[in-house]
Amino acid sequence: MKALRAVLLILLLSGQPGSGWAQEDGDADPEPENYNYDDDDDEEEEEETNMIPGSRDRAPLQCYFCQVLHSGESCNQTQSCSSSKPFCITLVSHSGTDKGYLTTYSMWCTDTCQPIIKTVGGTQMTQTCCQSTLCNIPPWQNPQVQNPLGGRADSPLESGTRHPQGGKFSHPQVVKAAHPQSDGANLPKSGKANQPQGSGAGYPSGWTKFGNIALLLSFFTCLWASGA
């Protein structure tokens, strides 16, 4: 009996340190796992920084925002675009009405944009895209926009025509009308211009002979009447 008790006591004493080591091993295992998670987070931050360099310092895109704007009206509203909307869009629509054609302008931020020109139901729509700040400004509101000939869009060209190569105005040439020659080539031979020919001024041709005959007939008639 004493021997059995001694064996049990030895087993109990030897089992306690083993359980303690096992518990210590279980506590020590999570530490390397937590360390690995920290390394993964650092790697993700490095990847995000490499994918978008300088994104923190970049100012957000701003676009003009007007839903319905008529020609000549000013658009005074702007909006800051999110990173998912990198385009400023301008939509111009031309539609026919009872009073003629009506043109409206719409502008805003968008995520995708493609320049198009199409006609839907008698309305022609023109869509333009740009990616710089306030680039979708109405053409009449921007004094820097120039027309293809070199003049500004909000004012007509000055006198003269702009040369396509030199970029300067070339005034039109003045052509003088050639005066008629004074040698009388276009005048009648026997008189001046705008006057009938013949000896009597202001009478048609042959009037002198007819007048003489008429006078003679009148004279003979008077003699016949007096003789009778």
Swiss-Prot record:
GPI-anchor amidated glycine-type lipidated residues: 198
Tissue expression profile of the protein: Detected in fat tissue. Detected on the luminal surface of capillary endothelial cells in heart, skeletal muscle and brown adipose tissue (at protein level). Detected in heart and brown adipose tissue. Expressed at lower levels in lung and liver.
Expression induction or repression: Induced by fasting.
Segments for region (Important for interaction with LPL): 102-108
Record note on disruption phenotype: Adult mice display chylomicronemia when kept on a normal chow diet, with milky-looking blood plasma due to marked accumulation of chylomicrons in the plasma. Their plasma triglyceride levels are generally above 1000 mg/dl and can be as high as 5000 mg/dl. Mice display decreased plasma levels of lipoprotein lipase LPL. Contrary to wild-type, LPL is not recruited to the apical surface of endothelial cell that faces the lumen of capillaries, but is mislocalized to the interstitial spaces surrounding myocytes and adipocytes.
Annotated segments matching region Disordered: 21-32, 145-200
PROSITE patterns according to UniProt: LY6_UPAR
Disulfide bonds: 63-88, 66-75, 81-109, 113-129, 130-135
SUPFAM superfamilies: Snake toxin-like
Signal peptide: 1-22
Region (Important for LPL transport to the lumenal surface of endothelial cells): 24-48
Cellular component annotations (GO), alphabetically ordered: apical plasma membrane; basolateral plasma membrane; cell surface; external side of plasma membrane; plasma membrane
Domain notes: The N-terminal acidic region is intrinsically disordered. This region contributes to LPL binding. It stabilizes LPL and protects LPL against loss of activity.
Function description: Mediates the transport of lipoprotein lipase LPL from the basolateral to the apical surface of endothelial cells in capillaries. Anchors LPL on the surface of endothelial cells in the lumen of blood capillaries. Thereby, plays an important role in lipolytic processing of chylomicrons by LPL, triglyceride metabolism and lipid homeostasis. Binds chylomicrons and phospholipid particles that contain APOA5. Binds high-density lipoprotein (HDL) and plays a role in the uptake of lipids from HDL.
Protein name per Swiss-Prot or TrEMBL: Glycosylphosphatidylinositol-anchored high density lipoprotein-binding protein 1
